[in-house]
Every structure is written in C-alpha cells, then in structure tokens.
Curated annotation (Swiss-Prot):
Entry keywords, A to Z: Chaperone, Cytoplasm, Nickel insertion
Family: Belongs to the UreF family.
Source domain of life: Bacteria
Subcellular location per the Swiss-Prot or TrEMBL entry: Cytoplasm
Lineage of producing organism: Bacteria, Pseudomonadati, Pseudomonadota, Alphaproteobacteria, Hyphomicrobiales
Entry GO MF terms: nickel cation binding
Name the record gives this protein: Urease accessory protein UreF
InterPro entries (UniProt xref): UreF, UreF_sf
Matching Gene3D superfamilies: Urease accessory protein UreF
Membrane-spanning ranges: none
GO terms for cellular component: cytoplasm
UniProt function note: Required for maturation of urease via the functional incorporation of the urease nickel metallocenter.
Length: 240
C-alpha cells in the first residue's frame, strides 16, 4: 500500500495523547460500573409490543432514536456541558444540567440517566479527579449521564468531538445489548446492527457538535411512549 492509498488519519486522532485515550476507553467501556446493563431505554416494551422483533427492526428503532430522539438530544447536552466546563462558566453549566434533566420523557428514563450520571461522576472523581471538577459538581443539583460525561471529559482536556463519538458508541452498544437479550439476537447479528449504525452515530455527532440548545427536539413518540408504558409492564428484565 502506497502512502496515498493509506486511510486518512485526522489530526484530532493523531493528537490524542495516550493517557486521554486510556481514560476515554475506560470511562465508556461496558466494564465501567455505571449500571447501564440494567436499563433498556424502553426497548423492552418495544419488543413486548412487537415493534422490535429482529435485527432489522432493532436497527431501524435505534437509528431513529439516534437521529430524532434521545441520542441527538443527549449529544447536544454533552457538547454544551463540555463547552461550559472548558470555559469555567458554572452558571451556564447549571443551566445545561437543569435543561437536560427536564428533557427526560419518563420517570424510569429519569432514573436511568441520573443514576448513571451519579455513578459516572463518583467513580471518575475517585479514580481520576481533576482540578475544578469538585466545584463544578457541587454547583449542580444533579447531572444526567451525558452532562456528567461532558463535564468529566472537559476537566481532563479530552476533545468534545472524540468524547461525543465514544459516548454515542457506548450508548448505542448498550441499546443493542438490551435488544439482543430481549429479541433475542446472536452475537454476530448484534455486531452487524452496530456496524450498520456507524454512519448514523457519526452523522449524529457531527450535527450535535454545531447545534445550539434551541436545536434540541424529539420526534420519537413511540420510543417515549414505550418508556412510559414500561413502568407498568407486568414481566420485565430491565429497570427502564
């Protein structure tokens, strides 16, 4: 392979130092103990209702959640929390945190994102504390998961674009994991769904980086209703 034939490596990737990469991979790994395995974001009801019953329908459901639902909204909140933390603008950070918490569509989804946000902050501070992080956390009543990731990432100097891609990959992987247990799907089919969603994750991240808080909105009514109906689902494996 000649130099001209080699895949292009962006400056952002080459400039990411090894400690930052190590932390990013650790924080957004399935092994990082935020309890994501216990939540399905309403997918359990979607399977119960027959909206999701195979790899293709799971891919379609998650694609819409990424582009028009909580995936995009949470991505924007992450970016703005990261930006406020970088600037040391605690008032702005508090506003973003409050808006993000208010935007959650159901009680169980509120539990899901606040519990994971709290766990993420506590564990990251215990193992990798950073100047200014304690003060930022103390000024916010509660941080939902994407806001917590944005704040911690900014405190450690990790670029928002890389942090955002890693976050969306982690969230999407967790959704697929829930779907694979519920439908069920095999490991190969699950990875095919993840591969098919790669361009969707990338496009969502690109949109979110340049989006304002006024651009936030959701059109995933079926997914929001699923998260509400899950609260009274008779038999269930997940907490949301």
């Amino acid at each position: 392979m000649t130099a001209s034939e080699r895949p292009h490596v962006s400056a952002a990737m080459t400039e990411l130092d090894h400690p930052a990469l190590y932390r990013l991979m650790t924080w957004l790994s399935p092994a990082f103990p935020v309890g994501g395995f216990a939540y399905s974001s309403g997918i359990e009801w979607a399977v119960e209702a027959g909206d999701v019953d195979d790899a293709a329908s799971l891919r379609g459901w998650l694609s819409t959640m990424l582009t028009d639902g909580s995936g995009f909204c949470d991505a924007v909140f992450l970016v703005h929390a990261h930006r406020a933390m970088e600037l040391g603008d605690i008032d702005r950070l508090r506003e973003v945190a409050e808006l993000a918490a208010a935007f959650v569509p159901s009680r169980e989804r509120q539990l899901e994102t606040t519990a994971q946000g709290r766990a993420f902050i506590e564990i990251a501070r215990s193992a990798w504390n950073s100047p200014g992080l304690d003060d930022a956390v103390s000024q916010c009543e509660a941080m939902v998961y994407p806001v917590a990731v944005g704040v911690v990432g900014a405190a450690h100097g990790i670029q928002s674009s890389l942090l955002l891609h890693a976050y969306l990959h982690a969230v999407t992987s967790n959704w697929i994991s829930a779907g694979s247990r519920l439908i069920p799907l095999g490991q190969t089919d699950s990875q095919r769904v993840l591969a098919a969603l790669e361009p969707v994750v990338t496009a969502t991240a690109v949109r979110a980086i340049s989006a304002s808080l006024d651009d936030i909105g959701s059109a995933t009514f079926r997914a929001d209703l699923a998260s509400l109906r899950h609260e009274t689902q008779y038999t269930r494996l997940f907490r949301s």
